[in-house]
């Protein structure tokens, strides 16, 4: 069975309850299914807390974090360090053999600078599946942070949804974007079960999908197109439904190419 990438987002990394639910679901799933799993994570909340503590400004442009040269080291420490090792610690606590990686390990995802105006923000493209496939074949759970590196050795902060998409393309994997919201909501706050590109454009034009959710929806649409298969946006809050989700049952919004 092709691998499944679970991209973690939102306040999940900041919530012990959420992490407990997620890792319990992962244990249950791994006990009953052979499907290889990969976790990709960002950690915006971890970065925001650190920046606040250091009295550094947080700037965003079109939903993407602006990353000046003097901040990339701090952001790398937060994402590839604190956030990544927090997840490895939870995996250890639940007796899951895991390995912490960043996008540059084994050239798994190739990264170039997205836009000079954004600073050290990277564009992710598919890379080599060798390292991660080797880990999966040996029963490890790869936990991959959304920090990448360019050919000339510049560290880059990559939008985690886009990083997960590039890695899914690399591995031929299915993709779930797991966050705080149970999916995409319509104007009345009701979950939308399925979403096409035209429906997404309509909701963006109407101002119903805004800010970070635009980035998330576009990343999911890009992923669905790139992978040639649906991508799920769902919430970690319904832990009892997660094993079904990991097995292909939609519980949030299914994004169609």
UniProtKB/Swiss-Prot annotation:
It catalyses: N-acetyl-L-glutamate + ATP = N-acetyl-L-glutamyl 5-phosphate + ADP. Substrate binds at residues 43-44, 65, 157. Its EC number is 2.7.2.8. InterPro entries: AceGlu_kinase-like_sf, AcgluKinase_fam, ArgB, Asp/Glu/Uridylate_kinase, NAGK-NC. It is found in: Cytoplasm. Signal peptide: none annotated. Pathway: Amino-acid biosynthesis; L-arginine biosynthesis; N(2)-acetyl-L-ornithine from L-glutamate: step 2/4. GO terms for cellular component: cytoplasm. ATP binds at residues 180-185, 208-210. One of its GO terms (molecular function) is acetylglutamate kinase activity. Keywords: Amino-acid biosynthesis, Arginine biosynthesis, ATP-binding, Cytoplasm, Kinase, Nucleotide-binding, Transferase. The record marks 7, 216 as: Transition state stabilizer. GO terms for biological process: arginine biosynthetic process via ornithine; L-arginine biosynthetic process. CDD domains: AAK_NAGK-NC. It is an enzyme of class 2 (transferase). Homodimer. Belongs to the acetylglutamate kinase family. ArgB subfamily. NCBIfam families: argB (TIGR00761). Catalyzes the ATP-dependent phosphorylation of N-acetyl-L-glutamate. This is Acetylglutamate kinase. It comes from Salmonella agona (strain SL483).
């Amino acid at each position: 069975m092709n691998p499944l990438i679970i991209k973690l987002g939102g306040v999940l990394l900041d919530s012990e309850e959420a992490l407990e639910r997620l890792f319990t679901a992962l244990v249950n799933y791994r006990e009953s299914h052979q499907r290889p799993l990969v976790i990709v994570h960002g950690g915006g909340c971890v970065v925001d807390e650190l920046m606040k503590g250091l009295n550094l400004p947080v700037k965003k442009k079109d939903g993407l974090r602006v990353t000046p040269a003097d901040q990339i080291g701090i952001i790398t420490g937060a994402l590839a360090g604190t956030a990544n090792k927090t997840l490895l610690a939870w995996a250890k606590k639940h007796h899951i053999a895991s390995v912490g990686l960043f996008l540059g390990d084994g050239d798994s995802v190739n990264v170039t600078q997205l836009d000079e105006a954004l600073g050290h923000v990277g564009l992710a493209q598919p890379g080599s599946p060798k390292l991660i496939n080797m880990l999966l074949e040996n029963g490890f759970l790869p936990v991959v942070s959304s920090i990448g590196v360019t050919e000339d050795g510049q560290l880059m902060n990559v939008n985690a949804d886009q990083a997960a998409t590039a890695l899914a393309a690399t591995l031929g994997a299915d993709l779930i974007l797991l966050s705080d919201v149970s999916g995409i909501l319509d104007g009345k706050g009701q979950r939308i079960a399925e979403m096409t590109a035209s429906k997404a454009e309509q909701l963006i034009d109407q101002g119903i999908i805004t800010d970070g959710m635009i980035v998330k929806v576009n990343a999911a649409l890009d992923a669905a197109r790139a992978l040639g298969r649906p991508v799920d946006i769902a919430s970690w809050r319904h832990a009892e439904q997660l094993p079904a989700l990991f097995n292909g049952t939609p519980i949030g919004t299914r994004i169609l190419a």
